[in-house]
């Protein structure tokens, strides 16, 4: 294949270059070979797939340094000051095999909550949708008919945080008076006893990963009271209390390698060993409250054993024994994680983000500046290659997920951007704003794909189902909206 490309170039008398394919980790593929300078990504794809000898050709993207080859190699080289006398390294990146299409219309406007909708979350397979509200209830919605399913009463204050277990069989909800309740989405009934112990409101909930424990027994909570607690949901008791933060803990992540990460208004992020609660290290660098953080492996941890490329039109529960689910989740996690340890990105009231490798080092990999106001949310794309951050400065910014390098600003909202969600194929991003709209962004083109007005007031919460079929949003108008293509 490489020889055929070279022969064709000779026939056309085009300038030629010596190139070498390598993967993102620097692993060489084949030997250097000769290509015409005007070679297109389609031709590179043919050659690269021939060298990879895959049964099914992979969709690939190609990069010279950080610049993607969009129309031809020559055009990309013109925009980069690249030395073409030597062998030119071309990095290939496998892309998602399936494609998520942008949602374009609101298919349902679901009323039922009597106060603002504070959080919305699809279950790991996209079968269920849950919402938490200022009216003290959690609601489950039937996605096949797009109608209310169950109203769950038990909290006595605003429901601030909800989180699905990675097997999709339980939802944890935390409220303003510090209590945590567990719910069964198939019945709408409370599971086990109320988990009480925090003295102030719950700021975050995070489950132990499926590949670590397929029974999904443990959930961690963070609170305004400055502590993190690990709960045994089967026994209904607090297993461990992690103390050390001097102010409110704002968010929490249970990583895939046995570490828990907590971020706080004391400007630090603490890294804990989940199985015994030992503090491993404290990450310092932010000049103000740390509001938000995300892991490069978040999508694999959220979806566990669910593979979106194999999803059916009507989402189902996960099938298989606990051991099979554990093995599937572990292989998906390892594939996502790659060679290095998971990366963490944090966003702060000081307008900056930091990229960390928290399992290895307490110093940040890089500091990311550019936002003009505090950062509300930060998220890695499902393939972990891009970080998106949403801010009170009305913009969303995109950053390289490995280096932290600034890539682009997505502008269009006319007020604060509260929350963002990625499509499963990492090609699209949806944002919800104080300006009452949702917007869908094409990440590669770095432009607006779809403007979605419809809410009557601020949009606080947005989520994209893991199978890519639906977006759900909620906010101050008490209405939950479902959007489809």
From Swiss-Prot:
Pfam families in alphabetical order: NLE, WD40
UniProt main location, coarse: nucleus
Superkingdom per UniProt: Eukaryota
Positions carrying N-acetylalanine: 2
Positions where Phosphoserine occurs in the chain: 79
Gene Ontology biological-process entries: Notch signaling pathway; ribosomal large subunit assembly
WD repeats: 112-151, 154-193, 197-241, 244-282, 325-366, 370-409, 412-451, 454-485
Family per record: Belongs to the NLE1/RSA4 family.
Function summary: Plays a role in regulating Notch activity. Plays a role in regulating the expression of CDKN1A and several members of the Wnt pathway, probably via its effects on Notch activity. Required during embryogenesis for inner mass cell survival.
Protein name, UniProt field: Notchless protein homolog 1
Species in which this protein is naturally found: Pongo abelii
